[in-house]
């Protein structure tokens, strides 16, 4: 009986160990194996681990406009308020660690403190057929608002601009997913990731899905003088779209041995991905004020119209023995627009404003230089 118990215990331990090994083998295969590759077009280096050093210059901005009717003494005056977050660029350096398709990056701000970008975090799972890219950053920058009042189409009879003494904070979370149709001959991440090399020029149609969430927080002082309609702003967008991407191979030389050194590959990528924002949720928060402090808040939740937006990028990748150098520029544009009735009874401006229309956009561009070592 003791021998049987010992045998069963040993069998259970070995089975659990085998299942654990089988799980990690599947994970390793998912991260490192590229299936259905046309080797005349795509080459996969043997090294799976990567260590990279990057430098990024980035600018992110927010611009919006609210149009409304202003009632006074029985007359309705047309009004426009505009809000803008400064676009001073931020420079940062960071590290990227990768294994196969998986890449994790983290960067911190350096240089002049014109734009206080506290952090950048990126998590990527990038394959030739499909991939996911998740990025988050926060940035503080100058915040300004303007107001114009006019009678109909006449020139404004009143205009004022306010520049907040303290910066406003923008937080930005973005998750992109893609699928490449011609993934047998086209390696989409070849110009910004070290795991794939494009041997011959090729391109493909792609589909993409994007989730974006952005928050803009104005300081109380800025809010008090920003004409009251929008002190905090949030937008959540889900977009679907597609486009075309192409890798132009400017130079390629296959490795001929372990000791063979030198330039291996130079590839230029161009990508254009127009998208349609199907879900466009907007939330604005307006505080109530008195002479000494602000208290309470009115929140407006609105679903905006479907809107066309755009994601574009270009990148240059250079393979030099075990080193990979990438220069990439990315630009994306997220537009929002909503017409809704402004409930003046619930606002601190007391029955003087209605028919508020809100529109604007978040825009973000970045230029990234990456040096990677494969091992």
Region roles according to the model:
Residues 101-107, 129-134, 183-187, 252-254, ...:
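Repeated loop/turn-to-beta-strand initiation elements of outer-membrane beta-barrel proteins
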Residues 66, 70-75, 215-322, 331-334:
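Outer-membrane beta-barrel transmembrane domain signature
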Residues 51-59, 97, 106-110, 125, ...:
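Transmembrane beta-barrel strands of outer-membrane/channel proteins
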Residues 20-27, 31-48, 182-203, 250-268:
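Short loop/turn motifs that connect adjacent beta-strands in outer-membrane beta-barrel proteins
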Residues 45-51, 91, 100-102, 128-132, ...:
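Outer-envelope beta-barrel architecture signal
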Residues 78-81, 107, 118, 158-166, ...:
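Extracellular loop and loop/strand-boundary signature of outer-membrane beta-barrel proteins
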Residues 175-177, 361-375:
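Outer-membrane beta-barrel "beta-signal"
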Residues 56-69, 73-74, 135-173:
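Outer-membrane beta-barrel translocator/channel fold
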């Amino acid at each position: 009986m003791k021998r049987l118990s010992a045998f069963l215990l040993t069998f259970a331990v070995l089975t659990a160990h085998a299942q654990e090994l089988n799980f990690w083998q599947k994970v390793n295969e998912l991260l490192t194996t590229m299936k259905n590759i046309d080797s005349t077009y795509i080459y996969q280096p043997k090294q799976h681990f990567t260590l990279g050093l990057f430098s990024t210059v980035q600018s992110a901005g927010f611009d919006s406009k609210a149009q409304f009717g202003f009632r006074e003494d029985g007359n309705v005056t047309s009004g426009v308020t505009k809000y803008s977050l400064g676009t001073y660029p931020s420079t940062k350096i960071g590290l990227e660690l990768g294994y196969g398709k998986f890449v994790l990056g983290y960067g911190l701000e350096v240089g002049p403190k014109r734009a206080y970008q506290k952090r950048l975090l990126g998590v990527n799972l990038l394959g030739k057929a499909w991939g996911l890219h998740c990025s988050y950053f926060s940035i503080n920058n100058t915040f300004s608002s303007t107001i114009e009042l006019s009678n109909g189409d006449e020139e404004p009879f009143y205009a004022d601009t306010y520049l907040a003494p303290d910066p406003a904070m923008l937080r930005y979370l973005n998750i992109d997913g893609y699928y490449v149709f011609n993934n047998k001959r086209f390696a989409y991440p070849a110009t910004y990731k070290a795991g794939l090399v494009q041997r011959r020029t090729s391109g493909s149609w792609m589909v993409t899905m994007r989730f974006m969430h952005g928050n803009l927080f104005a300081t109380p002082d800025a809010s008090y003088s920003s004409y009251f309609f929008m002190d905090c702003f949030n937008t959540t967008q889900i977009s679907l779209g597609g486009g075309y991407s192409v890798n132009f191979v400017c130079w390629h030389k296959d490795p001929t041995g372990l000791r063979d050194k030198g330039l291996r590959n130079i590839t230029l990528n161009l990508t254009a991905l127009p998208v349609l924002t199907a879900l466009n949720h907007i939330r604005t928060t307006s505080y109530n004020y008195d002479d000494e402090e602000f208290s309470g808040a009115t929140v407006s939740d609105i679903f905006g119209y479907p809107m066309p937006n755009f994601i574009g990028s270009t990148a240059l990748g250079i393979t030099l023995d075990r080193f990979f150098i990438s220069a990439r520029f990315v630009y994306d544009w997220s537009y929002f627009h909503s017409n809704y009735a402004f409930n003046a009874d619930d606002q601190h401006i007391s029955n003087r404003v209605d028919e508020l229309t809100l529109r604007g956009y978040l825009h973000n561009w970045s230029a990234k230089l990456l040096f990677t070592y494969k091992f």
